[in-house]
UniProtKB/Swiss-Prot annotation:
SUPFAM superfamilies: Quinoprotein alcohol dehydrogenase-like (SSF50998)
A single GO BP: protein insertion into membrane
GO CC entries: cell outer membrane
Residues with lipid group (S-diacylglycerol cysteine): 26
Role summary: Part of the outer membrane protein assembly complex, which is involved in assembly and insertion of beta-barrel proteins into the outer membrane.
PROSITE patterns xrefs: PROKAR_LIPOPROTEIN (PS51257)
Lipid linkage positions (N-palmitoyl cysteine): 26
Primary localization class, coarse: membrane
Subunit record text: Part of the Bam complex.
Signal peptide start-end: 1-25
Organism: Bordetella pertussis (strain Tohama I / ATCC BAA-589 / NCTC 13251)
Compartments it resides in: Cell outer membrane
HAMAP family associated with the record: OM_assembly_BamB
Protein name: Outer membrane protein assembly factor BamB
Length: 386
């Protein structure tokens, strides 16, 4: 699960945090310790009705680095076998499907004109909006989180703690910035965000950066977590999931760290911070921030104060994804292919749906048509409320 490596080698050390491994080095499911056993699914009083609207096959497999991108009425998605495609949001119909002719480790990011994916050896591959390969370029190390595309650039975060931008038209490297990294890093479902000309990215060690997408200059830096402890494992922390932005607020959560909301209109001043440890990520609405902790206990925090509003422990150890919003519910996927819907107001279980295809690893996406899920077997599933 961990490996030590020589200085300068990509991912100087890595901890794999997937649906089947605990950081203790033991399988959660084979352990005799009841603390790590997934909660059994229990009966509940349904509070909403959900259904599968459509299913579409992208390719084979899934992974932490594979979160589909939704733009308008289109979905861009990829799978580890090299499959890449564009799909209609309303029906799931494939508009185009292509192949990267390589195994993939991350994808797909898109701005509607350029769609980018990445390989385990750091190759970045861009497609035009007909599915034809546009260019190939090389990052300095492996890329394990989805690229982001916009403002004329394709941006990737590589395993040597570099954030790099390539010209979206021809693949020319535009800029590269690097921060010193910790001895161990987390392989997590991290995501970058592009907003108002800035690349918002977390880094191993608990930092959150806002980077000018045109120049690579760091415009702002915040601390989500501070490594603590005597050993490298105790000091392991990383910003997980996607940073969330709503108005003047930017919120993020870290493994072995905190959940924090910053005021971007006041130079990134922290508004509140609570000790918290998540392995997947968070989502926010106009009232609350929602996040599962590393044991899959879901909590809601008041967005203005950080006060804990509710906790839901009925899904404990089910390896929940980052949440998505659907109506008055919060949706999370789990290791058996179920999507659970919790009340935003009090956390009670409202609905449950099996979408099949094995463990859901990439976070569900809120769309105008419902919640989009990429399954463990490489399919897209649209879930709608009746």
């Amino acid at each position: 699960m961990m490996r030590n490596s020589r200085p300068g080698r990509a991912w100087r050390g890595a901890v794999v945090l997937t649906g089947l491994l605990a950081l203790s080095g033991c399988s959660m499911f084979s352990s005799d310790d009841d603390r790590y056993k997934p909660a059994e699914l229990t009966q509940y009083a349904p509070g909403m009705s959900v259904r599968t609207a459509w299913t579409a096959s992208v390719g084979s497999g899934s992974g932490l680095g594979f979160a589909p991108t939704v733009l308008g009425e289109s979905i861009y998605a990829a799978t580890p076998d090299g499959s890449v495609g564009k799909f209609d949001l309303l029906s799931g119909r494939a508009i185009w499907k292509s192949s990267a002719d390589a195994k993939l480790s991350a994808g797909a990011g898109s701005d509607g004109q350029t769609t980018a994916v990445a390989t385990p050896d750091g190759e970045v591959i861009a497609f035009d909006d007909t599915g034809k390969i546009k260019w190939r370029a090389r990052a300095t190390s492996d890329v394990a989180i989805p690229p982001v595309v916009g403002y004329g650039v394709v941006v990737v975060r590589s395993g040597d703690y570099r954030i790099q931008a390539f010209n979206a038209e021809n693949g020319e490297r535009m800029w590269s910035m690097q921060r010193p990294g910790p001895a161990l890093a987390l392989r997590s479902a991290a995501q970058m965000v592009l907003a108002e000309g800035l690349v918002i990215s977390g880094l191993p060690g608990g930092k959150l950066l806002a980077i000018n997408s045109a120049t690579g200059n760091v415009q702002w830096e915040g601390t989500v977590a501070t490594p603590r402890g005597a050993s490298d494992l105790e000091r392991l922390t990383d910003v997980v999931g996607a940073p969330r932005i709503a108005g003047r607020l930017m919120c993020a959560v870290a493994y072995q760290g905190r959940i924090v909301c910053f005021d971007v209109s006041a130079g990134g001043r922290p508004i509140w911070a609570k000790d918290f440890s998540s392995a997947s990520g968070m989502v926010i609405d106009d009232r609350f921030a929602y996040a599962p902790d590393q044991g899959s206990v879901v909590s809601a925090f008041a967005l203005d104060s950080g006060n804990n509003v509710w906790k839901q422990a009925e899904l404990k150890n089910r390896l929940l994804t980052a949440p998505a919003l659907l109506g008055e519910a919060v949706a999370v996927g789990d290791f058996e292919g179920y999507v659970h819907f919790l009340s935003r107001s009090d956390g009670r279980l409202l609905a449950r749906l099996s979408v099949g295809g094995g463990a859901i690893v990439s976070p569900p996406q809120t769309t105008s048509q419902g919640v989009l899920v990429q399954t463990g077997n490489g399919s897209l599933v649209m879930v709608r409320a009746n």
